[in-house]
């Protein structure tokens, strides 16, 4: 058993110099929910704590414990192993110098091992240790969840994680609270469950759980309807998600205090101080943006029921009810062209009366409007300040 912190650091150095050690991108220990009909099917992985480009000492200790219990790390991009009694005992013996300090926010990996040491072998069967060695497309449910946690906890930036194929890996299940239930099992047991009064309350049927089933938001973040935010979304402190027409998909979210009353689709990112009005839609990479992810800058206003399909810079306004798409043509006066060019000195487009939406992508200080008499779509230099109510954020 390791007795001192110096002994611990010496052991870590020794492990990291060994042939079996692989430095991970991310790792963690998860409790898994298994299929009711097929226990080999993993429906969900819950991580009490994840490590993302950090805590390499714990990674070394865990890998040594795996090595000592006969597990060999492969050359794949990820590795998932059962947590056994022997693994826990080995890992705990290496963590001895930190055990008394492992409370509160200190030494979360040690806290996880301490908790696991209180479980028997049958209980440990529902725990997995997961390593990601590179940001490749995930191959397991556990790896998908580890990446979703990285996004939702803010340890990985939005759009920085490879989630290719994740939707196909996750199983479509019925969610009752935090419990996933196989649909086949429900069908096979429907009669008995209903006759006995034990049929569960089904909140949703989806491959992704809700954000709040796994993540504790910042104190000044408000989510008024748990169904409106999917796991894998990222909400910066101060974000408010109202009920009704709001929705935030996975790998999408906010970078600061934002009022969300509309839809932020997959891979869309909204800057601080912006307001996504009631029913407004920011298109995702699969819904009309030619695969280009959309960023909305700071202090923008997307009016109620508007549609935004191009990236916007700071201080932009999209009036209620209009669609700003890549191919939409907007009239611009020569005077407004000069003002917009002054606000965006890097923009080197020559003046013309009509610009397509894609030609205006990423510019700041734009105001999109539809003429109420002619129906003509127009864009001009915004002269309004968008400012959120500080009391609400």
UniProtKB/Swiss-Prot annotation:
What cellular-component terms does GO give this entry? cytoplasm
Residues of the active site: 261
- Gene Ontology biological process terms in this record: diaminopimelate biosynthetic process; lysine biosynthetic process via diaminopimelate
Positions with a binding annotation for succinyl-CoA: 263, 278, 281, 304, 319-320, 327, 356, 369-372
Q: Its annotated pathway?
A: Amino-acid biosynthesis; L-lysine biosynthesis via DAP pathway; LL-2,6-diaminopimelate from (S)-tetrahydrodipicolinate (succinylase route): step 1/3
What enzyme category does the UniProt record give?
Answer: transferase
Keyword set includes Hydrolase: no
Q: Which GO terms describe its molecular function?
A: 2,3,4,5-tetrahydropyridine-2,6-dicarboxylate N-succinyltransferase activity
Q: Which domain of life is it from?
A: Bacteria
For this UniProt record, give its keywords in alphabetical order, as a comma-separated list. Answer: Acyltransferase, Amino-acid biosynthesis, Cytoplasm, Diaminopimelate biosynthesis, Lysine biosynthesis, Transferase
E.C. number:
2.3.1.117
Q: Which CDD domains match?
A: LbH_THP_succinylT_putative (cd04649)
By its UniProt entry, which InterPro entries does this protein fall under? Hexapep, THDPS_M, THDPS_M_sf, Trimer_LpxA-like_sf, Type2_DapD
Q: Where in the cell is it found?
A: Cytoplasm
Note one Pfam family from the annotation.
THDPS_M
Quote the catalytic activity from the record.
(S)-2,3,4,5-tetrahydrodipicolinate + succinyl-CoA + H2O = (S)-2-succinylamino-6-oxoheptanedioate + CoA
Q: How does it assemble?
A: Homotrimer.
Q: What does this protein do?
A: Catalyzes the conversion of the cyclic tetrahydrodipicolinate (THDP) into the acyclic N-succinyl-L-2-amino-6-oxopimelate using succinyl-CoA.
Q: Which family does it belong to?
A: Belongs to the type 2 tetrahydrodipicolinate N-succinyltransferase family.
State what protein this is by name: 2,3,4,5-tetrahydropyridine-2,6-dicarboxylate N-succinyltransferase
Instruction: Give the organism, scientific name.
Output: Nitratiruptor sp. (strain SB155-2)
């Amino acid at each position: 058993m390791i007795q001192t912190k110096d002994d611990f650091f010496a052991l870590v150095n020794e492990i990291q110099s060994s042939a079996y050690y692989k430095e991970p991108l991310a790792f963690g220990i998860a409790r898994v929910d298994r299929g009711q009909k097929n226990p080999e099917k993993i429906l969900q992985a819950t991580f009490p704590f994840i490590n993302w480009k950090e805590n390499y000492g714990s990674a070394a200790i865990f890998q040594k414990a795996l090595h000592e219990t006969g597990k060999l790390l492969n050359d794949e991009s990820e590795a998932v192993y059962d947590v056994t009694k022997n693994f826990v005992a080995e890992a705990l013996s290496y963590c001895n110098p930190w055990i008394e300090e492992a409370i509160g926010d200190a030494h979360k990996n040690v806290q996880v091992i301490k908790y696991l040491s209180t479980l028997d072998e049958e209980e440990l069967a529902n725990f997995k240790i997961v390593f990601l060695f590179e940001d490749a497309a995930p191959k397991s449910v556990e790896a998908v969840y580890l990446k979703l946690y990285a996004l939702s906890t803010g340890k990985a930036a939005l759009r920085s994680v490879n989630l290719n194929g994740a939707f196909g890996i996750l199983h479509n299940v019925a969610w009752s609270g935090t419990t996933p239930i196989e649909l086949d099992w429900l069908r096979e047991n429907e009669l008995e469950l209903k006759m006995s009064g034990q049929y569960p309350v089904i909140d949703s049927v989806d491959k992704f759980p809700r954000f709040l089933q796994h993540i504790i938001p910042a104190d000044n973040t408000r989510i008024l309807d748990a169904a409106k935010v999917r796991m894998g979304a990222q909400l910066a402190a101060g974000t408010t998600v109202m009920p009704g027409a709001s929705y935030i998909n996975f790998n999408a979210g906010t970078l600061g205090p934002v009022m969300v009353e509309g839809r932020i689709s997959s891979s869309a990112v909204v800057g601080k101080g912006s307001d996504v009005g009631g029913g407004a839609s920011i298109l995702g990479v699969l819904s009309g943006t030619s695969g280009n992810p959309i960023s909305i800058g700071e202090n923008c206003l997307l009016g109620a029921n508007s549609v935004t399909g191009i990236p916007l810079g700071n201080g932009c306004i999209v009036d209620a009810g209009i669609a700003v798409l890549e191919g939409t043509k907007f009239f611009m006066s020569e005077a407004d062209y000069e003002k917009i060019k002054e606000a965006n000195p890097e923009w080197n487009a020559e003046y013309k009366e009509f610009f397509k939406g894609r030609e205006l992508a990423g510019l700041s200080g734009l105001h999109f409007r539809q003429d109420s008499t002619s129906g003509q779509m127009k864009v001009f230099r915004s002269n309004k300040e968008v400012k959120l109510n500080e009391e609400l954020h």
